[in-house]
Amino acid sequence: MAQKDIGNKVPLHTLKKVEEVAAYYDEWALNNKYDKDMEAWNYTGPKETSETFNKYQKSKNIEIFDAGCGTGLVAVELKKMGYQNFYGADISQKLLDLAPQGLYKSLERIDLNKKLIYEDDKFDSVFCVGTFTFGHVKPDALDEFIRITKNNGLICFTINVGVYKDYGFDKKINNLIDDDKWKKLEFFKSNYLSSKDVNAWLGIYKVAK
């Protein structure tokens, strides 16, 4: 989640394999340390992204895919606003095990860099907060998010500024606009982990199929 390293044993940006990332987060989940750290570090990504999404989303009765959901921080914020139907996925089973019971309709251990198990147009909206960062999910995942999102649905995400250009997110986002796959509603820089001086680009895009 950090620009380079958030202080754990191994800098996240050095991890190359999916299973290494999964093991990193599994260890971080022990004794609920992940959630404790997020609270201590004033991690505002889930709240800010949810609030920005809520400005554009009218109906509360929608199905939301929470990609890289971790312990459920995004769904917790959305539930406060009246949303109820969440489907979560993450690479770390230990983080999934910490999600509040009953918060999600389903939870799946999934590598978001691969083709997703869901059918086309399955969800009304997709969230991916804190997952586009060093050693994690790559830009091509956006193609899958569009595939599983209904027309006019919203895709909401954060991208660590340290990987935005290096990983090619800038080109991917603009190519999807040029190809009429989605339209930009919001895109701005968020200081979403202020205590660690970590910034991210926060985007809200409407699917146009």
For each of these PLM feature ranges, what is it?
Residues F65-K115:
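Class I SAM-dependent methyltransferase SAM/SAH-binding core
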Residues D140-N151:
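A short glycine-rich, Lys/Arg-flanked "PGG" loop and its adjoining helix->strand segment in the class I
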